[in-house]
């Protein structure tokens, strides 16, 4: 997950500042420690850019300016946390681009989306149906261990390791397409 980073001159950053909005800010979003452990490990500024990345990815916004002053390193850390916490956001590629100033301040984040973003509602339905099949199969089992083992074994038998698979590091690739690699 190596971002494409580009250092830009101050004048170009000023032009970006005048034309590029912050997109969705993610204000009001909350992420519990139990379900979203990576979010909890972030600094306050990193959490802010995490919420902004999450909200813009939900809205399929491609380019936006960070709402708070953050470094390129902070953006990378926040982006990796979003990817780790949200495998259900299968339409978001595991790489992004950013522009930053000589002092390291990030001034633009460019998210990348895979082909499922073109018909996201249908893709979500296929993903949810595949996930529901696993949940239904595990539901009658007694212990959490048995349920986890059922899901593990079902995935191991249904998914083929394929370096050339489309979206090969996503939950969608594994659940819907049946081909993936370890992320």
Write out the residue ranges for each language-model feature:
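N-terminal accessory/pre-domain segments preceding catalytic cores
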Residues: 1-142
């Amino acid at each position: 997950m190596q971002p494409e980073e580009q250092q830009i001159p101050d004048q170009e950053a000023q032009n970006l500042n005048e034309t590029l909005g912050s997109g969705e800010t993610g204000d009001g979003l909350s992420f519990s420690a139990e379900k979203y452990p990576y979010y909890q490990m972030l600094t306050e500024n990193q959490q802010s850019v995490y919420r902004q990345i999450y909200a813009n990815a939900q809205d399929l916004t491609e380019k936006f300016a960070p709402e708070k002053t953050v470094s390129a390193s902070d953006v990378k850390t926040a982006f990796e946390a979003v990817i780790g916490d949200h495998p259900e956001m299968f339409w978001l590629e595991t790489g992004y681009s950013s522009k930053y100033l000589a002092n390291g301040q990030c001034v633009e984040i460019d998210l990348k989306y895979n082909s499922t973003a073109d018909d996201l509602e249908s893709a979500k339905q296929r993903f949810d149906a595949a996930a529901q099949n696993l949940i239904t199969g595990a539901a009658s089992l007694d212990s959490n261990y048995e349920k986890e083992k059922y899901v593990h074994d079902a995935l191991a038998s249904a998914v083929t390791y394929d370096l050339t698979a489309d979206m090969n590091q996503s939950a969608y690739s594994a659940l819907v397409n049946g081909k993936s690699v370890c992320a």
